[in-house]
Design a protein with these regions (language model features):
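Mature catalytic core of soluble alpha/beta enzymes
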Residues: 2-13, 20-370
């Protein structure tokens, strides 16, 4: 079993889940809907994708066709959704040969970049972020499978093929003139599998914002399943206002209460939490956040981690990684990597039925009471 991760005293080098940070939205269903405020020029698109809802707001006299956003989100789903039987990631996960390669043309440029980002973040967090955790997620009943009897022997047997190391799971691409011609995957164990859920929605909001940027839109907010990226200002000329939930056990999307409002401009903000999705085993709560280094649900007292970063992919993935690391190791990480430009809010179990709040100076500077 891996020793606990420790970021204290290490020389610095520069560079899923259920999210709970949200813009205040009106839930919607079915096909995309929206409106246009003629006075402010604010356009809004609302819809459903990736098993959740999305909201896209931007200031422009010209409205973008809903299909542009719907098609992009569907493309991401076709590549990395574990709930679509024929998705690319499920084809990779089903590949049961260790003596040959699984190859494909990565024409959508989804899986290749996600793998590259995941490798970078895996190294940065010393394995706290790891998309090969999928078999453990299934073992603990937080994926498509029901939870069975789980003990040390079951965990140890699965841990034998967890890890972003070449002899367990490896991916490479051959690039030609800026176009990835072919991608191949090698498995060291046929049971190895990928799960990009802890980064895919953050990456998706980055892609959606890029659509807006390419059209010259300077002021926009994109939210998907609680993962948010903001550009410029809102219709009032102020930073976008994003609400962060209180980590109240048993709360739902309908009866949530807010801990604070955050002013966000030209950044992404994402949250991961443990207080809404868990199993109870013999009276003990088992978080859906699985520590890839131990194979067991994280049990460090951290209830919620909110991260502001330059991209949605980074904020999304690091929010999950910080839930694995816990509050103290997250603080050590922030000290070690100031060049990442992160601002973070942590809410932890105080051992007395409540929670303690800690925020980095940069996060506190842009936060206010709801």
């Amino acid at each position: 079993m891996r020793k606990a991760i420790n970021f204290q005293g290490i020389p610095a080098s520069l560079v899923l889940a259920v999210p709970f940070v949200a813009a205040v939205l009106t839930a919607c269903g079915g096909a995309a809907t929206g409106n246009h405020d003629k006075e402010s020029g604010m356009q809004q698109h609302l819809g459903e994708a990736q098993g959740t809802t999305y909201s896209i707001k931007y200031i422009s006299e010209e409205r973008i066709d809903d299909a542009v956003f719907e098609d992009l989100l569907d493309m991401v789903d076709r590549e990395v959704s574990l709930w679509r039987p024929n998705s690319r990631i499920n084809q990779i996960n089903a590949w049961d040969r260790t003596d040959s390669l699984f190859g494909f043309v990565d024409s959508t440029q989804i899986i290749g970049p996600l793998w590259a980002l995941s490798e970078e973040l895996h190294g940065l967090t010393k394995g706290a972020f790891d998309p090969t955790v999928s078999p453990l997620v299934e073992l603990w009943g937080f994926g498509l499978s029901e939870m069975g009897n789980v003990g040390a022997s079951e965990v140890d047997s699965v841990m034998a093929f967890i890890g972003m190391v070449p002899d367990r799971f490896d991916m490479n691409e051959e690039e030609e003139a800026g176009y990835y011609k072919s991608t191949w995957v090698r498995k060291g164990d046929a049971r190895a599998a990928l799960d990009f859920n802890a980064i895919a929605q953050g990456y998706s909001v980055d892609l959606l914002m890029e659509v807006l940027r390419e059209r010259g839109i300077q002021n926009a907010m994109v939210e998907l399943g609680g993962e948010v990226v903001c550009r410029g200002t809102n219709a009032s000329g102020d930073p976008w206002r994003i609400a962060v939930d209180r980590p109240i056990e048993g709360s739902t999307e309908q009866d949530r209460t807010f801990e604070m409002i955050v002013a966000v401009q030209d950044r992404a903000i994402c949250t991961s939490g443990s207080y809404r999705k868990y199993h109870e085993v013999d009276g003990r709560k088992m978080s859906h956040t699985i520590d890839p280094g131990t194979g067991w649900p994280a049990a460090n007292g951290l209830l919620s981690a909110t991260v502001m970063a330059s991209t949605g992919a980074y904020a999304d993935a690091l929010a999950t990684a910080f839930m694995v690391l816990g509050a103290e190791q997250t603080k050590a990480f922030l000290t070690l990597y100031p060049g990442l430009g992160l601002d973070v809010l942590l809410m932890s179990d105080d051992g007395q039925g409540g929670y303690a709040v800690w925020s980095s100076p940069g996060f506190a500077a842009v936060s206010s009471q709801p």
